């Protein structure tokens, strides 16, 4: 049971990782004339990932706050 949950968690992580990588690549890499990443593309990709991580952290924080409020409301109702 725990192993299945770990596998699903890892699959979810990989799916999310691939979506972020694709989105940041599509948004940031526009020139394919060189084999190297230029400074503008690197900066864009770093900013893209940073924004995603901050957004994920903020959503997680809000979800926890919501869960706490629900638990308090359910405790007060009893």
Swiss-Prot record:
Highest taxon of the lineage: Eukaryota
Chain span(s) of sequence motif Twin CX3C motif: 24-48
- Keyword Transcription regulation listed? The answer is no
Sorted alphabetically, the Gene Ontology BP terms of this entry are: protein insertion into mitochondrial inner membrane; regulation of multicellular organism growth
SUPFAM superfamilies this protein is in? Tim10-like
What intrachain disulfides are recorded? 24-48, 28-44
What does the comment on domains in this protein's record state? The twin CX3C motif contains 4 conserved Cys residues that form 2 disulfide bonds in the mitochondrial intermembrane space. However, during the transit of tim-9/tin-9.1 from cytoplasm into mitochondrion, the Cys residues probably coordinate zinc, thereby preventing folding and allowing its transfer across mitochondrial outer membrane.
PANTHER family linked to this entry: MITOCHONDRIAL IMPORT INNER MEMBRANE TRANSLOCASE SUBUNIT TIM9B (PTHR13172)
Q: Which family does the similarity line name?
A: Belongs to the small Tim family.
Recorded protein name is Mitochondrial import inner membrane translocase subunit Tim9
Q: Which organism is this protein's natural source?
A: Caenorhabditis briggsae
What is this organism's lineage?
Eukaryota, Metazoa, Ecdysozoa, Nematoda, Chromadorea
């Amino acid at each position: 049971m725990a192993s299945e949950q770990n596998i699903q968690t890892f699959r979810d992580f990989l799916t999310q990782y691939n979506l972020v990588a694709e989105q940041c690549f599509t948004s940031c890499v526009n020139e394919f004339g060189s084999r190297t990443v230029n400074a503008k593309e690197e900066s864009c990709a770093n900013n893209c990932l940073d924004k995603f991580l901050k957004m994920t952290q903020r959503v997680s924080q809000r979800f926890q706050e919501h869960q706490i409020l629900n638990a308090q409301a359910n405790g007060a109702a009893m």
